[in-house]
A protein has these predicted regions:
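A short, gly/pro- and small-residue-rich
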Residues: 125-146, 264-290, 315-316
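Adenosine-phosphate binding glycine-rich loop
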Residues: 292-294, 298-345
Length: 345
């Protein structure tokens, strides 16, 4: 079967078919193996990819710039504060400026595609970032790639499973533990949602652990449940920090995320609350109860809070491998959606 994704937006892996996910992963692995060869280095020749950052980053900006360069193109950094864009607050205009409709259509004339990064600190309500990204995609006739919004992070999800497959092969039937952890960063849901969605799509058993009061949005939990049901796999939830670490778990993902009331109480109150729950940490004692599990994390890691140094820097940590894979999965996305590469699976 040949997979053609030319012109497709990539907003969330749940909106891709499993065949499209597998095609992207196949190409990313091929690109990683032939990184410095000539096979792919002219795919974006003389083309510009725009990177629109409402929020800062380390891995995302550098990996997208490197991806465009290695495909023969150029990535241009944009910030909203340098552009005269219209701003609204809960539907009320607070700053006059250009509408998304107008800005998006103009940007599409200049570029082969655009990535957008807009997290919770740039919006007032959960889902607003994703809605803004989709509004740009609506008005642009070139591919829009989600570089992380307040709901989803498809590039991270693809990179997670690529690293997991590299170390343990086919993921079907294997078990992952996604566990909340305390910390000082008040993190959004995007990477957590994406990992839960893509691992359940690819046939994994999923365990989810979090303290009471840190439930994930029900709409995303419903999708994970449906994915597991469709694959005949298990989905379990616990509110015990120890219960998820069992002898069938082959991957552990410990990460902080904020509570459902974050937008009401604010970042400082959220950090004060979360920092008290010190039992919620991934340590070696807990990892020893698993099936020699690998430790994964999207980074940046809040060491000593989300995970101990012993685990994060230990032999079973694949966090740096996954971070590298951001480059390769993003090259694959750009190659298929922008350059129009077709992949046989």
């Amino acid at each position: 079967m040949q997979i053609d994704m030319k012109g497709k937006d990539v907003v969330c892996t749940q909106e891709l078919s499993v065949d499209e996910i597998n095609a992207l992963l196949k190409l990313a692995k091929e690109m990683k193996a032939a990184r410095y060869g000539d096979k792919y280095n002219q795919l974006l020749k003389d083309q510009t990819f725009l990177m629109f950052f409402f929020n800062p980053s380390l891995r995302t900006r550098i990996s997208f710039e490197a991806a465009a360069t290695e495909l023969g193109g150029h990535a241009q950094f944009l910030e909203p504060k340098t552009m005269r864009l219209k701003k609204t607050s809960n539907g009320v205009e607070v700053q006059a400026g250009e509408t998304i409709e107008d800005a998006a259509q103009v940007l599409a004339r200049y570029a082969c595609g655009m990535g957008i990064r807009i997290l919770e600190t740039s919006v007032e309500n959960y889902g607003d970032g994703n809605a803004i990204l989709r509004e740009y995609a609506k008005w642009m006739d070139v591919p829009v790639i989600n570089m992380a919004d307040d709901k989803y992070h498809p590039c991270q999800g693809l990179s997670d499973v690529m690293g997991m497959q590299e170390h343990k092969g086919d993921l079907k039937g294997k078990t992952i533990l996604m566990t909340w952890a305390h910390g000082d960063l008040a993190r959004s849901y995007c990477s957590v949602h994406e990992n839960l969605l893509i691992t359940s799509r690819l046939g994994m058993n999923v365990k989810l652990a979090f303290p009471k009061g840190y439930d994930l949005p029900e709409e995303e939990i419903a999708k994970v449940k449906a994915n597991c049901e469709a694959n005949g796999t298990k989905f379990e939830i616990t509110n015990d920090p120890d219960a998820g670490y069992t002898d069938d778990v082959e991957f552990v993902y410990s990460r902080n995320w904020f509570g459902p009331d974050f937008y009401e109480i604010g970042k400082e109150a959220e950090i004060a609350r979360a920092s008290k729950m010190t039992d919620w940490i991934c340590n070696q004692e807990r990892m020893d109860r698993t099936k020699d599990a690998l430790y994964i994390h999207p980074m940046p890691v809040d060491r000593g809070k989300e995970v101990t140094d012993e685990v994060a820097s230990g032999p079973n940590s694949i966090i740096t491998d996954i971070a590298e894979n951001r480059l390769h999965t993003q090259k694959a996305i750009m190659a298929m959606t922008i350059a129009g590469m077709k992949i046989d699976i």
